[in-house]
Regions:
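Aromatic-lined carbohydrate-recognition surfaces of secreted/lumenal glycan-active proteins
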Residues: 162-188, 249-265
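N-terminal carbohydrate-binding/catalytic regions of secreted carbohydrate-active enzymes
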Residues: 12-125, 274-281
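Glycoside hydrolase catalytic-domain groove-lining segments
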Residues: 61, 66-76, 82, 207, ...
Length: 281
């Protein structure tokens, strides 16, 4: 006889499915391979409807541009977010298999309130879900950071978060910035204070190893754009980040919406081993 614990879980595991590097994989196939569902399935989209290349995926619209970095296109090279088709088919597929949808959406911070309300209303039918808005916004590579200041990005998050809470109360907003710094403060803490307060969930992305020069160079000793860090370093960074954010903005959940070890850097064996070490830590 086996005993089951019906209380709250000690942790939860989500699965990213599709990004700038990969197509969406249907949930029947994933469940057949892994044998069990996850709490949520993450999907990634972009929304820049006023750009001249829209609604094409930007890498296809600008296939003749001289690009040397994944994020050098006019807007982010995720699949385009639109009112019908791909995003909604995927969310229905996720929900059919008893999982929550975790949408990441990079979008134009100059969109009107009417346009933002339209996006929020489209999320109503999909039950409990999260939306991560303009993620990794402490960086410089995504379009929202190229076109807007950090303060503008933070204020936009808070404003869009308010609209989502009004129009789609089933949706929790996720603010994804950086980690606590050497001085103890969060990265861009002052500029992002309003966003930390407005969010339902905080996130910080974590790649123990990452080939960020993909697909334009090779991750090899002496060449290529890549990095590798220790499990212990990231575990300490998460702890310090949560403690600082909670002390300044009240306790909220902190997740890592993107976590992996890039097999381009480590190879598949160490990729799996390092993820296990992080989970055990």
């Amino acid at each position: 006889m086996q005993k089951l614990h019906l209380g709250a879980a000690q942790c939860a595991l989500d699965l990213g499915d599709g990004s700038e590097r990969a197509e969406y994989v249907n949930q029947d196939y994933i469940l057949h391979k892994l044998g069990r569902p996850h709490r949520a399935i993450g999907i990634m989209y972009t929304y820049y409807p006023h750009d001249k290349q829209w609604p094409q995926r930007i890498s296809k619209a600008c296939k003749d541009m001289n690009i040397t970095f994944q994020w050098d296109y006019p807007y982010d090279d995720y699949f385009p977010f639109n009112a019908d088709g791909q995003p909604w088919e995927q969310m229905r597929d996720i929900r059919r298999h008893g999982q929550d949808a975790a949408l990441t959406l990079t979008l134009d911070c100059s969109l009107s309130d009417d346009e933002l309300r339209e996006v929020a209303r489209m999320l109503r039918p999909y039950g409990r879900m999260t939306i991560r808005i303009n993620h990794e916004c402490g960086g410089t590579w995504f379009t929202h950071n190229k076109r807007f200041t950090y303060e503008q990005v933070g204020k936009f998050f808070a404003h869009f978060s308010d609209i989502i809470h009004q129009e789609a109360p089933n949706v929790r907003t996720v603010f994804c910035a950086g980690f606590a710094q050497a001085d103890g403060k969060l990265e861009k803490e002052d500029e992002f204070a309003v966003a930390y307060r407005a969010a339902d969930v905080w996130s910080a992305d974590c790649y123990l190893a990452l080939h960020y020069g993909w697909p334009y160079d090779v991750a090899e000793v002496g060449g290529g754009q890549y990095k590798a860090d220790s499990v212990g370093m990231y575990y300490d960074m998460f702890r310090r980040t949560y403690e600082r954010a909670s002390s300044q903005f009240g306790a909220k959940p902190l997740v890592t919406a993107e976590f992996n070890t890039d097999g381009d850097v480590t190879g598949p064996r160490h990729q799996g081993e390092s993820v296990i070490r992080f989970a055990e830590a």
